[in-house]
């Protein structure tokens, strides 16, 4: 069995230290095959926050891919946001949007953040044509028999969670990756765990909760994805739930 830990929205700068320690202990004890971090590592994209995030991820000792979340772009420093938005990522560079191949499972990144959008709320999702083209190109390199999981920060379409991604270009992107053979799209942003089918082709949309203090009434959580052959299930593991994983409806 392959086991992936899907974690999101850690928000260093507003992290929950107990939740960080809980997740780290689970990684050390269970040694998952890989960790998929679907964005919002930081709260305000400050250098100290990225340094703390990098130290934490490196300490886990497992293969990691990291997506860029809206909180990982400078908000108030517009020069940094437009000219050098990723300068503070240097220590994390090898993990950012890193494709992974793990025992017949391919993790393919899809960028859903933008430096600028023609709307007031830049925290919402956006899939540009170049980002989608890169993802589809990476998918074409995946062996035919692999399961393909797309890793993004924002849900490509909203699924009824308490907050929304409102991802522009998301429906088009979802249809494109489904047609190209994706089996699931993993995301964060909304801080709610979910696993729901989309359409008739078997594609699933899987969202992780948060390890930060911004839990919106639910305890901190992450997803464990268990894969056997061509079948996989999502378990939402919530801090403080005694010894039992909570199966997400899907």
Please provide the spans of the model-predicted regions.
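Beta-strand-turn-beta hairpins that frame and shape the catalytic cleft
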Residues: 1-5, 99-109, 140-147, 198-204
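N-terminal active-site segment of His-dependent metallophosphoesterases
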Residues: 1-59, 75-76, 95, 137
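Active-site neighborhood of phospho(di)ester-bond hydrolases with catalytic His/Asp-centered motifs
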Residues: 6-8, 35-40, 64-70, 111, ...
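Active-site environment of divalent metal-dependent phosphoester hydrolases
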Residues: 13-15, 43-48, 70-78, 114-120, ...
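Extended active-site neighborhood of metal-dependent phosphoesterases/phosphodiesterases
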Residues: 52-137, 142, 176-178, 223-224
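Short acidic, glycine-rich surface-loop motifs adjacent to enzyme active sites
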Residues: 139, 143-159
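Conserved beta-sheet core of the metallophosphoesterase superfamily
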Residues: 162-230
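A short C-terminal boundary segment appended to hydrolase-like catalytic domains
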Residues: 226-250
């Amino acid at each position: 069995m392959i086991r992936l830990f899907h974690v999101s929205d850690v928000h260093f700068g507003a992290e929950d230290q107990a939740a960080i320690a809980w997740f780290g202990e689970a990684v050390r004890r269970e040694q998952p095959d890989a960790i998929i971090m679907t964005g919002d590592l930081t709260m305000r994209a400050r250098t100290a926050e990225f340094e703390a995030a990098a130290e934490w991820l490196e300490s886990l000792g497992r293969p990691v891919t990291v997506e860029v979340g809206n909180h990982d772009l400078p908000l108030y420093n517009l020069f940094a946001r437009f000219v050098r938005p990723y300068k503070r990522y240097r220590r994390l560079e090898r993990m950012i949007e890193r494709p992974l191949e793990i025992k017949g499972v391919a993790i393919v990144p899809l960028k859903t953040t933008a430096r600028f959008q023609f709307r007031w709320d830049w925290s919402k999702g956006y899939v540009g044509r170049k980002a989608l083209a890169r993802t589809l190109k990476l998918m074409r390199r995946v062996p035919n028999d692999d399961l393909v999981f797309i890793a993004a920060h924002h849900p490509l379409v909203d699924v009824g969670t308490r907050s929304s991604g409102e991802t522009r270009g998301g429906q088009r992107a979802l249809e494109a990756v489904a047609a190209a053979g994706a089996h699931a799209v993993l995301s964060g942003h909304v801080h709610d765990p979910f696993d729901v089918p989309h359409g008739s082709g078997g594609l699933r949309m899987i969202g992780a909760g948060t390890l930060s203090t911004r839990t919106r009434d639910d305890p901190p959580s992450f997803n464990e994805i268990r894969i056997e052959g061509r079948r996989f299930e999502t378990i939402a593991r919530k801090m403080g739930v005694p010894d039992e994983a909570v199966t997400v409806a899907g």
